[in-house]
Amino acid sequence: MAKKSLIQREKKRQNLEKKYKILRNSLKKKITETSSLDEKWEFQKKLQSLPRNSAPTRLHRRCFLTGRPKANYRDFGLSRHLLREMAHACLLPGVTKSSW
């Protein structure tokens, strides 16, 4: 189980990313569309003034039950440990153990 503070930090980053997503995308679009170098510098400064944690690259996918940061499956939102346990317990519909 991950520390509660790390899980809360990740939730804070997700909220910041949602809050600044539209503004960040519009600034990036303006940077690519303008031809004037001075305007590009101005938009770039505005983009850099946004909070660092509002960038989507700062987000990290975590298991939503345990908060484990590594070995997560996107389709389920679970870590590999919980995916295996829940699949064996038939708690994930449509997931079967393969055998060949």
UniProtKB/Swiss-Prot annotation:
Protein keywords: Chloroplast, Plastid, Ribonucleoprotein, Ribosomal protein, RNA-binding, rRNA-binding
Domain of life: Eukaryota
Pfam family, one: Ribosomal_S14
Subcellular location: Plastid, Chloroplast
Subunit structure as annotated in this protein's UniProt entry: Part of the 30S ribosomal subunit.
HAMAP family tied to this protein: Ribosomal_uS14_1 (MF_00537)
Protein name according to UniProt: Small ribosomal subunit protein uS14c
Native species: Marchantia polymorpha
